[in-house]
Structures are given as C-alpha cells and as structure tokens.
UniProtKB/Swiss-Prot annotation:
Function of the molecule: Transfers a GMP moiety from GTP to Mo-molybdopterin (Mo-MPT) cofactor (Moco or molybdenum cofactor) to form Mo-molybdopterin guanine dinucleotide (Mo-MGD) cofactor.
Organism: Clostridium perfringens (strain 13 / Type A)
Cellular-component GO terms for this entry: cytoplasm
Species classification: Bacteria, Bacillati, Bacillota, Clostridia, Eubacteriales
Gene behind this protein: mobA
Protein name: Probable molybdenum cofactor guanylyltransferase
Origin superkingdom: Bacteria
Keyword Transferase on entry: yes
Enzymatic class: transferase
Annotated SUPFAM superfamilies: Nucleotide-diphospho-sugar transferases (SSF53448)
Chain positions recorded as GTP binding sites: L9, A10, G11, K22, D66, D95
Bilayer-spanning residue ranges: none
Length: 198
C-alpha cells in the first residue's frame, strides 16, 4: 500500500468533446474513470474532484467540488490538497485512459524530497499525472484568488523533482508507453476506439 492519496480530476463536460463528460467515455468495455481507479488501487486513498458529485456515486469514493470553480485544473488540484488525509497526492486527469499501475506506483514510491514530483514525457512536463505535497495548497490558493490559474506557471513556484526515466517501461506492453496520453477531441476518441495509434 502506498501511503499517499490519489485524486482524479473529473472537471466535467469538454467543449472539444461536444460537451460529453470524458470520465464516462468507454474504452475496452470500461469507462475511462474505471480504468483509472483500477490503476490507482495501491494508493491508500482515492478521491474524485468534480462539480457534479452525483454522477460518481456508483464508485463509492468521496467526491469534492472545486473551492474556486471555473479556474481549470489548478482549482481541482487545490481542492484535492484541501481534502486529502495524507501529506502527498497523486493527481490524475480523467481523460487519460492508459494510466498504468506500474507507472503510478513507481512515482508513488519515489523518496519524498520534493513539493511536486512531475514526469516529463516527449519533452513535456505532465502536471496532470504528478504528485503534489499538501502544503502546496496555500500558494495555489493565492494564485487562484488573483486569477493566475496557469498550472505549469504555478508549478515553477515550488521545488520540483522531474522524472524522465522509467526503468521498467521497455519491459511492458507498448500501450503502457502511452501512459501520459490524454483524449481531448472527438476525433482522438474515435481513433482510440478504432484501435488506431494516437
């Protein structure tokens, strides 16, 4: 058991997905959110951040709303850090159907000498599959109050540990390398269900 919390950001309906809730898109018989919950099962606590908590009752998890709504993923992370019981929280977006248990467990077992532990994949930081220290919430709140809600910009206000290598990644099935891919548009989703490469 990983003594950290995990939070799934399920912000709601996306304009680029014709206002469908991406958490409830299906892939291989499961909703995206079901696939993510399965991948996070070794974390001590799993919560969901959503402004529509009634949609998630079937999962038996605690659901919390944004404290500062309509300010994007930074608001969701801030809310998660205010509600978790542990000192660290893995944050995962609900539109990442390839989240892999081995990857998130590897992140969860890295020594806690950071405020943010953030993977880097294909030369891009991945703040929506990253671990945040609970104490980050105070600076995040100041940013939200000032309507400065750019997530990456805010991340640079903290001590970040960047993870670029996953020693086991070449040993697993090719699809696991897609761990950090997210599905944003109708076309991307249609390609996914047709089993095309993303």
């Amino acid at each position: 058991m990983i003594k950290k919390s995990a939070a799934i950001l399920a912000g709601g309906k996306s304009s680029r997905m014709n206002y469908r809730n991406k958490a409830f898109l299906k892939y291989e018989e499961d909703y995206f959110i079901e696939r993510i919950i399965k991948a996070l099962k070794d974390y001590e606590e799993i919560i969901i951040i959503s402004n529509n908590p009634e949609e998630y009752k079937e999962f038996g998890l605690k659901v919390f709303k944004d404290i500062y709504p309509s300010q994007g993923p930074l608001s969701g992370i801030h809310s998660a850090l205010n509600h978790i019981k542990n000192d660290y929280c893995l944050v995962v977006a609900c539109d990442m159907p390839f989240i892999n248990k081995d990857v998130v467990n590897y992140l969860g077992n890295i020594k806690e000498d950071y405020e943010i532990l953030i993977p880097k994949f294909q030369e891009r930081l991945q703040p929506l599959c990253a671990i945040y220290k609970k104490s980050c919430k105070d600076i995040m709140e100041k940013e939200l109050i000032n309507n400065s809600n750019k997530l990456i910009k805010t991340c640079f206000k903290f001590s970040m540990k960047v993870v670029e290598e996953f020693p086991f990644i070449e040993k697993v099935h090719k699809k696991e390398i897609k761990n950090f891919y997210n599905i944003n548009t109708v076309d991307e989703y249609e390609d996914l269900i047709k089993k095309k490469e993303i």
